[in-house]
Amino acid sequence: EMDVLDDLFEQEYQKKTQQYRDSITLTNVTDRYIVEAEKYIIDGKAEKAIEMLNELLSRNPEQRQQAFIHYTFSEAYKDRGETDKQISELAQTALLDLKSATKEYASLQKLAYLLYDKGDVDRAYKYLNCSMDDAVFCNARLRFIEVAKFFPIIDKTYKLKEERSKFI
């Protein structure tokens, strides 16, 4: 029953995010362009989004905006199936989040998933643990739900790996 409620909560959150993205009036030009780049990605125009994001980065935006730009780059590269570039952009975002002491984020957990898929269980485990701790710290329910869905898989794999290494 909890999974059904969590899924409904997540679906409702995504629906509202889309509604706000469509109707938001942004006073900051950089923020407006980031939202436009997101729309291009959703519309299957990742290349156009990448061009726009490169232009934004060339303007030396503030650190928090840089994090959003790199995260949006990661979404564009995901759309294009360029996993290595997606990982690189998520790592950039995670570093910027760390520098700004941001605790409510998606980048580190997405990075953990991708690293796990590539077989880097140790880093995936560390990053997901950090994501879980930060989600609890700032009471970010959606982030906690997202991490909690995947954590048991990485945790089990990590513990099996640790167990095997004791016997070698």
Task: Write out the residue ranges for each language-model feature.
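A "functional boundary" signal
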Residues: 1-163
